[in-house]
Amino acid sequence: MKQSPILTFRSSAFPVAPGEDADTNPGIYGKALAQWLSTRLGARGLACGEAFAEDFGWCVGVKMGDKGVHLVCSSGETADTWQVFCFTERGFLDRLRRRPDAAETLEQVFDAVKDCLSAAPEVKELVEEE
C-alpha cells in the first residue's frame, strides 16, 4: 500500500448526519466531506464513485485511466477538524504480472484534493503532515 501525506484542516461546512457513525467506528464521521470532495474532483474531470463507509472513515474511489486511488475522509478530535489522505493498493496479480504501481496517479489525485481544499473559503488552517 502506498499512502499520501495527511491533510488536516478546520471547517464547520461538513455536517454530521444523525447515526452516521453506525457504518464506521463510533465517533468517526466524514460522509459530507467525502461527498463534497467527490463532487469537486468530478468537476475537475476525475472519475469518482459514491462515498462509502469503512471502519476508519468515509472513502471515495477515484479512477484515472486504469489506475485507482482511494480517498479517505475522517473527523478529527473536535467537531470542526478533519483529515484526508489517499492511498492505493497493488494487488498480488498486479505484482505477479509486473504491472507498474499507481504512485504517479496517487500523487495526481492527492494534488487535486489539496487544490480543492486550498481553494475552498470554508476550509481553514490546511496543513500537510507527513
Please annotate each region the language model reported.
Residues 9-14, 26, 67, 95, ...:
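Aromatic-enriched hydrophobic runs in primary sequence
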Residues 101-130:
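Intrinsically disordered, low-complexity regulatory regions enriched in serine/threonine/proline
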Residues 50-53:
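Short beta-strand
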Residues 34, 38-47, 114-125:
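Structural alpha-beta junctions
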Residues 55-105, 109:
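Amphipathic protein-protein interaction modules
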Residues 1-36, 42, 46:
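N-terminal low-complexity, intrinsically disordered segments
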